[in-house]
Curated annotation (Swiss-Prot):
Protein name: Pyridoxal 5'-phosphate synthase subunit PdxS
Record: residues binding D-glyceraldehyde 3-phosphate: R171
Principal EC category: lyase
EC number: 4.3.3.6
Catalytic activity, reaction form: aldehydo-D-ribose 5-phosphate + D-glyceraldehyde 3-phosphate + L-glutamine = pyridoxal 5'-phosphate + L-glutamate + phosphate + 3 H2O + H(+)
Family statement drawn from the similarity comment of this UniProt entry: Belongs to the PdxS/SNZ family.
PROSITE patterns to which the protein is assigned, alphabetical: PDXS_SNZ_1, PDXS_SNZ_2
Organism expressing this protein natively: Thermoplasma acidophilum (strain ATCC 25905 / DSM 1728 / JCM 9062 / NBRC 15155 / AMRC-C165)
CDD domains to which the protein is assigned, alphabetical: pdxS
The organism's place on the tree of life at top rank: Archaea
Chain's role: Catalyzes the formation of pyridoxal 5'-phosphate from ribose 5-phosphate (RBP), glyceraldehyde 3-phosphate (G3P) and ammonia. The ammonia is provided by the PdxT subunit. Can also use ribulose 5-phosphate and dihydroxyacetone phosphate as substrates, resulting from enzyme-catalyzed isomerization of RBP and G3P, respectively.
Residues binding D-ribose 5-phosphate: D30, G159, G257, G278, S279
């Protein structure tokens, strides 16, 4: 029987999660050209993220950041043999279907781009292509998994070259899982109810607009055709799975601020399953060497002879102090 490679990449939740797990232990690099994609592949990247501008340039330019030009994505896909991912705006259903049609291997519903929907993220179970989503804490991760994310990543603060927010996010997820493991079923139900609340914001606004007060309308079909009871039940099932496994049921990568080999090693030490590097490679003075060095450090993160050697002779991208960025301008604040 001949295997259909497309069916191995796309389709059921199990297949989508399995494809995502194949990148475990590796580095995924942002690229904006076919030449950069070739550099990433030669350096040992397990996948590339095709986009028009790296996060540092998106941050500097301001305005509205959208899906990359499909022609640019196709050029990158034609240039390399490793998987190619692409970013989609939060909640932008049509961008997601366009990228799926192109044949990208995975989508990133990304806060780096300007959100399209003020109420909802994509219902990723309607897509055949796997999707990665960012999370700052366990509730955000659980919501994205409920929606169908096949991979979670920290949000960090993209484009800053500053690792502190990625560290904050993975530590919060780890701590909250540790607490969750000791919870009773009754406590888990309360957590599920709290995590579910963001799916009813639109219905509450409709109630206030129409009835003058919140809470006057039912929660039937509040999100993706599901009402409150089903949403809470499915989220509770995910929480029980996390409690049983002692970790997220999907791979959890680090992203947002990784700028040096030591940054990559740090995130692996803290429990990340792999690392995304956005601006840190092609905003550094020597992208080829930086790319190789980060891959070496991530793959050998507990061998500090290797990490030290990988760090020699490198200069990272210019960094940004997080405290200098107003909270409402921080990309990590996008999403719900």
């Amino acid at each position: 029987m001949t295997l259909d490679l497309n069916k191995l990449r796309f389709g059921s939740e199990l297949i989508k999660r399995g494809f995502s797990a194949m990148t475990k232990g590796g580095v995924i690099m942002d690229v904006t050209t076919a030449d950069q994609a070739k550099i990433a592949e030669a350096a040992g990247a397990v996948a590339v993220m095709a986009l028009e501008r790296v996060p540092a340039d998106i941050r500097a330019a301001g305005g509205v950041a959208r899906m990359a030009d499909p022609m640019k994505i196709k050029e990158i896909m034609d240039a390399v043999s490793i998987p190619v991912m692409a970013k989609v705006r939060i909640g932008h259903i049509s961008e997601a279907y366009v990228l799926e049609k192109i044949g990208v291997d995975m989508l990133d519903e990304s806060e780096v781009l300007t959100p399209a929907d003020p109420f909802f993220h994509l219902y990723k179970k309607n897509l055949t292509v796997p999707v990665v989503s960012g999370a700052r804490n366990l509730p955000e991760a659980v919501r994205r998994i409920f929606e169908g994310a096949a991979m979670i990543r920290t949000k960090g603060e993209a484009g800053t070259g500053n690792i502190i927010e990625a560290v904050r996010h993975i530590r919060k997820v780890n701590e909250e899982i540790s607490v969750l493991k000791r919870m009773s079923d009754e406590q888990l139900r309360a957590v599920a109810s709290n995590i579910s609340a963001s799916y009813f914001v639109l219905r509450e606004e409709a109630s206030k607009d129409l009835m003058g007060v919140e809470g006057k309308l039912s929660y039937d079909s509040a999100y993706a055709g599901m009402g409150r009871s089903r949403i809470e039940r499915e989220i509770l099932a995910i929480l029980r799975q996390i409690r049983r496994m002692g970790r997220l049921p999907v791979v959890n990568f680090a992203a947002g601020g990784v700028a040096t080999p030591a940054d990559g090693a740090l995130m692996m030490e803290l429990g990340a399953d792999g690392v995304f590097v956005g601006s840190g490679i092609f905003k550094s003075p020597n992208p080829e060497k930086m790319a190789r060095s980060i891959v070496e450090a991530v793959e050998n993160y507990r061998d500090y002879d290797v990490v030290e050697k990988a760090s020699e002779g490198l200069q990272g991208m210019p960094g940004v102090d997080i405290e200098s960025i107003p909270k409402d301008m921080r990309l990590q604040e996008r999403g719900w």
